[in-house]
Amino acid sequence: MPMSLRVATLLALLLFVVACGAKQTNEESESEECVTEQTMLVAELEEGKTCEVIADFGVVTHRAIVEMPIRVVNATDEPIVLVDYSTTCRCTMLDLDRAPIEAGGECEIVLTFDSRGEWGGVGNFLDITTSNPECGFVIWMGATVE
């Protein structure tokens, strides 16, 4: 997929994030290589909707492994479990807490991107399976590896 199409797709999906209720808060994050300010993404799971989150890692140094926490909020009336996920690339991983998220509760998951073997614009898709088939959850991940 041409890079301009990837960028256009990520920008278009950013508009969908607003519609599903994803919110952002600023938090500081430390890694072994540097200290950076990072945006904490919030995914709000609602019955009858698919929550789409765009996780933009920005510029990533080649061979770096970077993480982004995502707060998942259960806005339904029933407990939800994040059962499993599928991804378009093995360089993108998700650390799921498979404990039930109570109604109105929240948990934190961690999205990891391993840039080893990647160059230039990278865009991946993660589809998270929940215990409620009426609550969809997807993550669009982007990074530029230099």
Model regions: which residues?
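Surface-exposed binding patches on compact interaction domains or structured appendages
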Residues: 77-105
